[in-house]
From Swiss-Prot:
Its cofactor is Mn(2+). The gene is pepA. Its EC number is 3.4.11.1, 3.4.11.10. It catalyses: Release of an N-terminal amino acid, Xaa-|-Yaa-, in which Xaa is preferably Leu, but may be other amino acids including Pro although not Arg or Lys, and Yaa may be Pro. Amino acid amides and methyl esters are also readily hydrolyzed, but rates on arylamides are exceedingly low; Release of an N-terminal amino acid, preferentially leucine, but not glutamic or aspartic acids. This is Cytosol aminopeptidase. HAMAP family: Cytosol_peptidase_M17.
Length: 503
């Protein structure tokens, strides 16, 4: 679908459809009032007759309104004006896209971007409208033989801004929104792929294709098991021992700043393409969803795609830590003691706490890049789901300014995170009688002790950890990957690149 931005009054728009808002109780938005005035009260008369209350999600499609050049006007209920927040704004946009498609509109001029959303400017409203529209239209049917094509006639959406001064920021918002939406789609597509297709080799092939598409300043290196062995990544290797699929670590390097002192930001994604739990095997119910255990790597891939598409003037490295945790005659066992790349030893008490065993070696590996900051993204703990549910990502960090940056980016993007502590008292739960540490610390504070485990391998740089176990995918009827936290990390990198969304 094509997006553009313009500035103009509604009475001068000649389009298939104009979209305007109506508030509760039957209150016209300023743009709707203009249309009502030129139509001699036609719209307000309909509202007085009870055709539309203005409640969230209500719609009313008007045809051939007197004195209006456009063929149709779509009235969208926006709820109470003072209560219109970010979440409700996105829901209104989603309802708009679905209604326009259902009613056969091929193009529309949308004035909803002129609604007042507290604390949000036109750049934010246009960008969120683009991202929400693309999210609404997303489907994953690549593997279906009988594809039922949904009715999607909508081809063009024009967002209106109040004055010509906002056109530049509106165009930038569309550019950024499309790049972020493409990154989210890429992450969702990877996450939704079945594990018999999407293994570590598949992740590596996608990373190579990304480098081919942006060969100007993106290179990809794939590190196999033999090289990992030479590097001393025994913890990472142990996790994949039970699988017939080779563990592969894909390193994507984007160079947007040629300055010698421009240190990179490193993103590390957990890429367990299937997690059976290993010898500590998971229950069969819901095990199919363990294909989503690579959503951290999928998100990093999506972010790298966004960065390359926008050619941000920063250096970013993305690492996809591909692996598969399976039971078998060669699988690692509870009771094993592993020597990590850092030299520290780990006693394995549970083979289903494997993500941290992969990540700890990758976090040591990335020291060679002398990073500005390292952020790992992982579907790491069920404990984080218990703590924060399915709406907010868990954040831990060893550097307060980095944590504050990520929280700010989460608020800007609407892809929210909440910081959890990393106190020394939690480290005591990882004590082992036979190694430097155990790979689990018991049930209390499980998300935090997992973060504490990782923190032992991040002492040489500023680091943050995003636990997306509760936010990376949805279960039930709407089962599927969400693409989070691509939007959060994209905003973080946009801020680092100087695009903070201010007009």
């Amino acid at each position: 679908m094509e997006f553009s931005v313009k500035s103009g009054s509604p009475e001068k728009q000649r389009s298939a459809c104009i979209v305007v808002g109506v508030f509760e109780p039957r209150r016209l938005s300023p743009i709707a009032e203009q249309l009502d005035k030129i139509s001699d009260g036609y719209i307000s008369a309909l509202l007085r007759r009870g055709e539309l209350e203005g409640k969230p999600g209500q719609t009313l499609l008007l045809h051939h309104v007197p004195n209006v050049l456009s063929e149709r006007i779509l009235l969208i209920g926006c709820g109470k004006e003072r209560e219109l927040d970010e979440r409700q704004y996105k829901q209104v946009i989603q309802k708009t896209i679905n209604t326009l498609n259902d009613t056969g509109s091929m193009e529309a001029v949308c004035f909803l971007t002129e609604l007042h959303v507290k604390g949000r400017n036109n750049y934010w409203k246009v960008r969120q409208a683009v991202e929400t529209a693309k999210e609404t239209l997303y489907s994953f049917d690549q593997l279906k033989t009988n594809k039922s094509e949904p009715r999607r006639p909508l081809r063009k959406m024009v967002f209106n801004v109040p004055t010509r001064r906002e056109l530049t920021s509106g165009e930038r918002a569309i550019q950024h929104g499309l790049a972020i939406a493409a990154g989210i789609k890429a992450a969702k597509d990877l996450g939704n792929m079945p594990p018999n297709i999407c293994n570590a080799a598949y992740l590596a092939s996608q990373a190579r294709q990304l480098a081919d598409s942006y060969s100007k300043n993106v290179i990809t290196r794939v590190i196999g098991e033999q090289q990992m062995k030479e590097l001393g990544m025994h913890s990472y290797l142990a996790v994949g021992q039970g699988s017939q699929n080779e563990s592969l670590m894909s390193v994507i390097e984007y160079k947007g700043n040629a300055s010698e002192d421009a240190r990179p930001i490193v993103l590390v994604g957990k890429g367990l393409t299937f997690d059976s739990g290993g010898i500590s095997i998971k229950p069969s119910e819901g095990m199919d969803e363990m294909k989503y255990d690579m959503c951290g790597a999928a998100a990093v891939y999506g972010v790298m795609r966004m960065v390359a598409e926008l050619q941000l003037p920063i250096n970013v490295i993305g690492v996809l830590a591909g692996c598969e945790n399976m039971p078998g005659g060669r699988a690692y066992r509870p009771g094993d003691v592993l020597t990590t790349m850092s030299g520290q030893t780990v006693e394995v008490l549970n083979t289903d706490a494997e993500g941290r065993l992969v990540l700890c070696d990758v976090l040591t590996y990335v020291e060679r890049f002398e990073p500005e900051a390292v952020i790992d993204v992982a579907t790491l703990t069920g404990a984080c789901v218990i703590a924060l549910g399915h709406h907010i990502t868990g954040l831990m960090a060893n550097h307060n300014p980095l944590a504050h940056e990520l929280i700010a980016a989460s608020e800007q993007s609407g892809d929210r995170a909440w910081r959890l502590p990393l106190g020394d008292e939690y480290q005591e739960q990882l004590e082992s009688n036979f190694a430097d540490m155990a790979n689990i610390g018991g049930r209390p504070g499980g998300a935090i002790t997992a973060g504490c485990f990782l923190s032992r391998f991040t002492r040489k740089y500023n680091w943050a950890h995003l636990d997306i176990a509760g936010t990376a995918w949805r279960s039930g009827k709407a089962k599927g990957a969400t693409g989070r936290p691509v939007a959060l990390l994209a905003q973080f990198l946009l801020n680092r690149a100087g695009f903070n969304g201010e007009e």
